[in-house]
Amino acid sequence: MTDNSNRQLAHIVFFDLNDDSAEARQALCEAATKYLSGHDGTVYFSVGIVGDEFTRPVNDHNYSVALHVVFENKAAHDVYQTHERHLAFIEENKANWKRVRVFDSYLA
């Protein structure tokens, strides 16, 4: 089995919202920035709304907000998952989540 312990890990989350208004999308982006940015071991953080103007056949618009976080390694990701700020983000925002999809991958 491959040792991935020192590889960067991309944590990508797609949120579908019950209230999919522009205001609700913006509120989730602001909450994500407040609670999820600046964690130890974070290499990259971004959050934003779906780009509806991208209309190629391969573009997937089945989400409202996308979160992208790259961690130095899996250990940093694991600490983030149980950090009080991450848990507060979930608790304060989950009522408006219709569906959440998480894609975690090791980077080459």
Where are these regions (language model features)?
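Short S/T/G/P-rich N-terminal loop/turn motif that feeds into the first structured element of a domain
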Residues: 1-64, 68, 72-79, 106-108
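Charge-dense polyanion-binding interfaces
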Residues: 92-108
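C-terminal structural segments of small proteins and small subunits
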Residues: 74-94
